[in-house]
Amino acid sequence: MSFNHFDEQGQAIMVDVSGKEPTLRTARAQAVVRLRPETLQAILDGRMTKGDVLGVARLAGIAAAKKTPELIPLSHPLAIHHAAVEFATDPETGEIAVTATVRAFERTGVEMEAMVSASVAALTVYDMCKGSDKGITIGQVALLYKEGGKSGVYRREEER
């Protein structure tokens, strides 16, 4: 098995994608935040002391997608054409499913941008709620979907 993030001497490199043709790339990723149900209800009712938790988390996730190459060393800087963050809440369990979608017309995929976006949005929910709920967890960070490029379409089993 060869690893394309290393040169012949075993040194880390950023993969050369200059010879690839740009194509439309889309990726969707998710992270799940678990809070106490009463904390989630306070978020939904707009009663959190730090303000609009989901609004701020949405903006943080979008900004994070654009900052991915600054956080992931071998990630390519990309001209992102679309970034969105959505939330699905379950008041009974206290779960927030954070879903990030990123799109670009590029030579390499946007999976890392979607993963970073969902993760940072989830971390922002944590940051804004940690004062009132010490038991918050974040998990199930996963790529749900990707398309574009020679590898074609990937859809996570749970999404099929």
UniProtKB/Swiss-Prot annotation:
Keywords: Lyase, Molybdenum cofactor biosynthesis. GO terms for biological process: Mo-molybdopterin cofactor biosynthetic process. Homohexamer; trimer of dimers. It catalyses: (8S)-3',8-cyclo-7,8-dihydroguanosine 5'-triphosphate = cyclic pyranopterin phosphate + diphosphate. Pathway: Cofactor biosynthesis; molybdopterin biosynthesis. The keyword Lyase applies. HAMAP family: MoaC_B. Substrate binds at residues 74-76, 112-113. The active site is at 127. Belongs to the MoaC family. GO terms for molecular function: cyclic pyranopterin monophosphate synthase activity. Catalyzes the conversion of (8S)-3',8-cyclo-7,8-dihydroguanosine 5'-triphosphate to cyclic pyranopterin monophosphate (cPMP). Its EC number is 4.6.1.17. InterPro entries: MoaC, MoaC_bact/euk, MoaC_sf, MoCo_biosynth_MoaA/MoaC, Mopterin_CF_biosynth-C_dom. The keyword Lyase applies. This is Cyclic pyranopterin monophosphate synthase. PANTHER family: CYCLIC PYRANOPTERIN MONOPHOSPHATE SYNTHASE, MOLYBDOPTERIN COFACTOR SYNTHESIS PROTEIN A. CDD domains: MoaC_PE.
